[in-house]
Amino acid sequence: MHIGNAAAQEDVRIAPAPETDILLELGVGPLIRPSFEGSSQYEIVPSPIIRLHYLNIPGLIEIGQGLDTGLSIGPSFGYTGERKATDVPGLYGLEDLDATYELGLRLGYGWSFAPEYGAEVYGEARYAFGEATGLVGGLGANGIFRPTQSLTLKFGPTATFASNGYIDTYFSVSPQESIASGGALDIYDPSGGFKTVGLSAEARLEFQPSWFLNGQAGYDRLIGSAADSPIMQAGSRDQLYFGIGISKVFSLDLF
């Protein structure tokens, strides 16, 4: 689970004026999420909102049309906080972990079948650095419903993946850690691959021109090597998250 993500995505109510070069949305809000991947304990963290709706560099590139249609591209980032074994019953013997940061790109493609209905698919890949290093990312698809001009609803399946280095950091148990746990945690050497599958839902309301109320909720189920880790004895394979935030779209004329 990530503290937040930035993505290029368009909204039916947002359309660039002829002189606009960039439509950038910025905001923030609280996110309730597991305190670490696989945890049954939850925490509240700040979740930034950064969306690139439109970018036009004359003579070079134009991305986004202000609708949920066509190709979108933008930044994607994530953050995993510290994990202290002494804070979690059942993890005694494991080494403490520092924070991991993730930075990468998100690609998406959207279709609009009617003013009220649409769909989108997306993928994102990020490089993780800090405590863990490696490649992480996700895939997903959404059905889109617009009951009014100011309200957009999205719902669909998701999946995430991670490379060996990342999975090893958060789900392995070394021989030394197994001994330190008194044998409560077996030695475990996981491998990279798909990490979770789940469902996500989003609601987005424009309550004033260029001002938005954003809500999100999701469920992830740990799978593969992550789900088989002895660390799951101290947590849960089922992961939930809920978030809400306020954002504003800024229009910039740079070129």
Predicted feature locations:
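Short glycine/proline- and aromatic-enriched beta-strand/turn motifs that initiate or cap beta-hairpins
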Residues: N5-P58, S251
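Transmembrane beta-barrel domains of outer membrane proteins
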Residues: A17, G29-L31, R51-H53, G64, ...
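Outer-membrane beta-barrel transmembrane domain signature
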Residues: V12, Y109-F113, A132-G138, N142-R237, ...
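Outer-envelope beta-barrel architecture signal
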Residues: P18-L24, Y42-P46, L67-I73, Y101, ...
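Transmembrane beta-strand segments that form the barrel wall of outer-membrane beta-barrel proteins
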Residues: L26-P34, P58-G66, V88-Y92, G118-F129
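Transmembrane beta-barrel strands of outer-membrane/channel proteins
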Residues: L24-I32, P75-Y79, V121-Y127, L139-A141, ...
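Solvent-exposed loop/turn segments connecting transmembrane beta-strands
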Residues: F36-Y42, L97-T100, R126-G137, G193
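Glycine/small-residue-rich interface belts in oligomeric ring/scaffold proteins
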Residues: P48-Y79
